Amino acid sequence: MRIKSLVLALVATLVFGAELSAQNGNITPVPAIVRGGVCNGEVCSPAVPFDYKQPFKLSFEGVDMVDAQRLEAAAVAAGLDVKRVKHTAKRGYLHFTVKPEMIHDDEGYAIVTTQDGIIVTANTASGAFYALQTMRQLVESGDWQTGIIGDYPRFEYRGVLIDISRHFRSVDFLKRQIDMMARMKMNRLHLHLTDAAGWRLEVESYPRLTSFAAWRTPHDWKGWSNSGCRYVEQGSEGASGGYLTKAEARELVAYAADRYITIIPEIEMPGHSEEVLEAYPELKCSHKPERQADLCIGKEATFEMMQAILDEVIDIFPSEYIHIGGDEAAKNSWKECEDCKRRMREEGLKDVDELQSYMIHRIEEYLNSKGRQIIGWDEILEGGLAPNATVMSWRGEEGGHIAAEAGHKVVMSPHGYCYIDAPQDAPYSQPESIGGYLPLEKVYSYEPVPTTMPKEVGEYILGVQANLWAEFIVEDSHYEHMLWPRAIAVAEIGWSQPENRDYADFRERAIKIVDGMIEEGYTPFDLKNEIGNRPESKQDVDHLARGKKVTYLEPSRYYAPKYAAAYDATLTDGKRGTWTYADERWQGFLGRGGVDVIIDMEEVTTIHSISADFMQICGPGVFMPCLVEIAVSVDGENFTKIADIEHEVIIDELPSFKSFGWQGETQARYIRYKAHRSKYTGFLFVDEIVVK
């Protein structure tokens, strides 16, 4: 009777929302409600330390056998000493009640801790499991007090993408990441199984996908990419790669399910399919025998293959969603392919965007007939979205918002916040990566549903996902370093209510989690030693040319639209760049020209120095200039060169930053600054031309 009354009191608290929003520094993601002490009717007791080391009598109500076994295992993993009993004990109990509509959300939970024991209430077994993850953190903190915790997730989808195509990962490695995801109350693991770099799932109907397309030489993606992207037969000399057998995949699915995580498999189509086309070249577009990336949509054999593969995939993975990729199809080969042109004529398709949409629609219809739904990258919007498709928005937020406005479900994973393959600290201090800079604070700042979005549109946002691509991540230790703790930030975005989130508080909690992970043998980024952003970017620089007009000469006036920063004001706006060229401070130049600009100082001025910073990150094709010329003029017509600065551009792995400038004394109104690109094709990035 006492247990029942406590449960009812707690449920009333959660439903009617008393003022209980104090945060608990030991729980991540931060819970919705934490209250010290317990009230039973008019009798209230203050919070006191709770003896969590005592033996507990474990009992269940409304829990089936499978879930009871899972919850008992989770209780043991949480560090609790439990013994199953049939009936609820009077003291020293850990009792679970799982009934529909008891709590705010299906994944929500409530914990009442008294001196007599612990009561957990949840709508579903997954909610009870998340309660145990909270209890695990209380045990690890050594600070568990009597009181009430009421919690529920903000979003139903809280995920991580792990890329095992670029570099294959073992089942044991994936299990370790699943363990940590579960502790952070994440519930979706998106496995990127196929891409140009290798096919990673056994398919019996097309065996060359694993006997050939899963193996390459050399082992590392960068070396493989630079040496011609060559696939080799399994077992041949130097062959490197691997794949999940069906048995291993099923083992992984079961392991995740025991932790209430759903694995969503991704089978890329129609783009990113080089490995498929090298294993089965008959699926290439008809006019080009050489290497291709896009499946031929004109050939019916393509659909026969994809449907056969999907039949085997859905037999392994019980997930509601099957991810079908849909991103970055080049589409060029379709324009010339006779089979594709015939398909377009027969189906009345006006362009290649509609041709891709035709394939996505057919695949969706097929998967719907099997009781599954498709999810794809936001390119599936192009040419018309399939009626039941869910969109994963990665190129920004716009695609997701468009899909939500059209009534489609959306998972937000925008590049600028959720692509955690970029360095998380000063790039020179980090292992080689794809470039950029995405610190924990930037990840944590992401808001999936803007305040300007109408409520009825925001309801289509299912949640959020961190994506970790592995082009430059060879070792498992490096992968964990990139994944954690940034995935923890995404977990809190997905779970916690926005009014409860605070970065300073989160960072302190994340440091504790990272320290614990290191003790357990994980290799996360050690947040305590974070260097932070580029010092030059932390405050505006005041100089003689600040705010002055900049004229861009041909061809440099065509700075790349994607990296326009503040447009024509960029180079004299007083803002220095951060560690990343994507910060809207660095201005990027691409093409045959370099940087060639004239600054009008408005009047003849005494000048002692002129300089500008450039960056080099070779992975994404960002290089230093090979020559910088600086000239000055009084009238804007006749220029006198005052500096020729030569630089040998050397390919290296680590990002670098360099200032190219002149010092001396001169009188001038106009300054011409010209930076020449080197023999390496790619971008030049410059942030500010500083004149003193």
Enumerate the predicted regions with their spans.
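Flexible loop/turn segments at secondary-structure boundaries
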Residues: 168-170, 196-202, 270-276, 323, ...
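Predominantly extracellular/luminal regions of secreted and cell-surface proteins
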Residues: 539-576
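Flexible, acidic glycine-rich loops studded with aromatic residues
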Residues: 374-379, 384-389, 395-540
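Feature activates predominantly on carbohydrate-active enzymes
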Residues: 102-303, 307-321, 362, 366, ...
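Bacterial Sec-dependent N-terminal signal peptides
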Residues: 1-25
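Active-site neighborhood of glycoside hydrolase catalytic domains
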Residues: 276, 285-286, 290-387, 394-401
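Contiguous, structured surface segment used for ligand recognition
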Residues: 23-155, 478, 490-520
